[in-house]
């Protein structure tokens, strides 16, 4: 194992991974929900969902509008797709599923439809009552910029902004970043995506910069891959009896996996690399970095 694969955080992330034991049953390795998709954006929820599965979750449910459902189903038969997000009684139909899910990802491909955003805001409020761990990405973050109270003091929330989304949430003054993060209250973690991803813990005021940088190719969908991978790692971290900073370690694991997938795929495909090429590398990256090895 190379020296770069021996960092303390990577070792902690490796310890989260459940062993593949014959006694385990379907669902124990993670039941993940993806809330997103729209007529224009069907790829994003698919990328997030399939990444969660390929990292190791057992089941992934996608909650999307009717117009996106058939397309997403066509991408993969492994996904469970619910065309409910724009229905008149969306909350009534989706709420019973929430209890069954371990972690939800809110935002990939969601779009800005006013009524759907209202529905998603209500889902976030219900998830808070259920103490459901959330990862909020993409247009889910737009919703938070409109009402930061949705996640203030919500222990178990991870926000995943890129550089532009980060500035919208917290301003451009880097010297005031931690003070601005204080608006979130306690228990919210932020991973800012960039050349080197930065993880901020609003509870402890801890900051960590991930050393892995990937390649110069920035294809669309990488953030969705990270969000899906993060959901699986986060569930494993929350289930761990030893991990004292589950969100921090899960963010590090997802960032490292995503950047390394980028590096591997770029080596194979160069400038023509797409997110699908990165997803094809998940199995190899996971085996190299996270899988339990027999002595």
Swiss-Prot record:
(6S)-NADPHX binds at residues 109, 162-168, 224. It is an enzyme of class 4 (lyase). Its cofactor is Mg(2+). CDD domains: YXKO-related (cd01171). InterPro entries: CARKD, Ribokinase-like. One of its GO terms (biological process) is nicotinamide nucleotide metabolic process. Disulfide bonds: none annotated. SUPFAM superfamilies: Ribokinase-like. It catalyses: (6S)-NADHX + ATP = ADP + phosphate + NADH + H(+); (6S)-NADPHX + ATP = ADP + phosphate + NADPH + H(+). Residues 9-289 form the YjeF C-terminal domain. Keywords: ATP-binding, Lyase, NAD, NADP, Nucleotide-binding, Phosphoprotein. Pfam families: Carb_kinase. Its EC number is 4.2.1.93. One of its GO terms (molecular function) is ATP-dependent NAD(P)H-hydrate dehydratase activity. Signal peptide: none annotated. ATP binds at residues 193-197, 214-223. HAMAP family: NADHX_dehydratase (MF_01965). Catalyzes the dehydration of the S-form of NAD(P)HX at the expense of ATP, which is converted to ADP. Together with NAD(P)HX epimerase, which catalyzes the epimerization of the S- and R-forms, the enzyme allows the repair of both epimers of NAD(P)HX, a damaged form of NAD(P)H that is a result of enzymatic or heat-dependent hydration. Belongs to the NnrD/CARKD family. This is ATP-dependent (S)-NAD(P)H-hydrate dehydratase. It comes from Anopheles darlingi (Mosquito).
